Amino acid sequence: VKIKELFVKPRSPRLPEPLPEATLLIAAYNEEAIVASKMVNCRQLDYPADKLRLVWITDGSNDNTNERLKEYPEVTVLYQPRRQGKTAALNRAIPYVKTPYVIFTDANTMLNKGAIKEIIRQFSDPQVGCVAGEKRVEIQAEQGATAGEGIYWKYESALKRLDYRLYSAVGAAGELF
């Protein structure tokens, strides 16, 4: 990586002006308890609300997730009663995407305020085909197990930064890509 960087300057894409429309696909399974928090998080994103379409895909949820989502008229909800898994749910949602950018996230993943702009900014580079988010685990003092998970994701993030510097991506965490 260091040798490559001696000969090639790092990329620094700019955010397109005007900002393009984007769709945020939110995968959910029995997420009744998190709907309100996720919607607050979505409303706090630093991206124009009129340019960010929110689509929730609930796959086989048998709690009150869909009822909670009815409280948000700006949201499109795609529900399937039979659970087929996250990949099938996301694939089912793709035909509803009418924007040039689609961003996948999970209902229980809270996004950084600038996440959408940062993802869109990276796509200004025509060589970019996928952008992966960086997962940060909030460590709960009473839950020692999350400390190990936090260390793992720091390691994964370091590997992804190396991937980026080599103009490649081996994978993306399912929480944000």
Q: What are the language-model segments listed below?
A:
Residues 41, 58-66, 82, 109:
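A conserved acidic beta->alpha catalytic loop
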Residues 80-97, 117, 154, 171:
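Glycine-rich, basic loop-to-helix element that forms the pyrophosphate-binding segment
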